[in-house]
Amino acid sequence: MRLYSKDYLLDGKIIYYQLKKGYRSGIEPIILAAQVKNNFNTILDMGSGCGPISLIVAYRNPNSEVIGFEKNEIHHKISVLNNKENNFENLKFKVHDNCIFDKNYENYFDLILSNPPFFFTDKVLKSKNISINNSKYISELDLEKWLNNIILYLKAKGTAFIINRFENIDFMLEILKKFNLEVTTTPILSFKGSKPKNVLLKITKSDYFIEKTSNAIIIHD
């Protein structure tokens, strides 16, 4: 019996395997992949899981070099299978802990897409499922390392998009304020008039720190 299900992305254009019992992709990869509206030479999917963001971006941007970093080895193996099934020559996945800086990629990426774990380990009860545990829970120290590495991996004129919990926004902004960045926050609402659960951050390098707010993304009209 297979441990993963065979699903599809982009109305069947992309074959997508993911764990049956473990972390399964939600709306976040679709929102992040939709932010890629220009041509970028080098794109990093930081925390790539089974690869939904990378697969969509590689399909839509065949001339871009797309790399996925993922710590969980089971997720990584499935992402490699997904790449093989879809035959994307511009995509590769690496087993890598996003909280550990890889100097080989310093100032390397034009674009970074990332959906770090949402929940702080000391504030919630953690799942015993390793796949879910790796995908949903993180310490405050490790989230700070993750964000720091995003900035270090970006080129001077690079851009990053990050989705996380709306309630974590103040914590993340305090970290980002240490850098010269322009940060635009966009609340993500399930319905018009509802309270935001998640937030999209757009980050670009700047001469000094600037914070902006954009109109909310509403998932269900």
Go through the PLM ranges and name each one:
Residues 34-105, 111-125:
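Conserved SAM/SAH cofactor-binding pocket of Class I
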Residues 116-145:
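Mobile active-site "lid"/loop adjacent to the S-adenosyl-L-methionine
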Residues 190-221:
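SAM/dcSAM-binding transferase cores
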Residues 11, 61-63, 88, 106, ...:
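Short, well-ordered coil/turn elements that cap or connect secondary structure elements
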Residues 32, 115, 146, 203:
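Residue-level signal for inorganic ion chemistry
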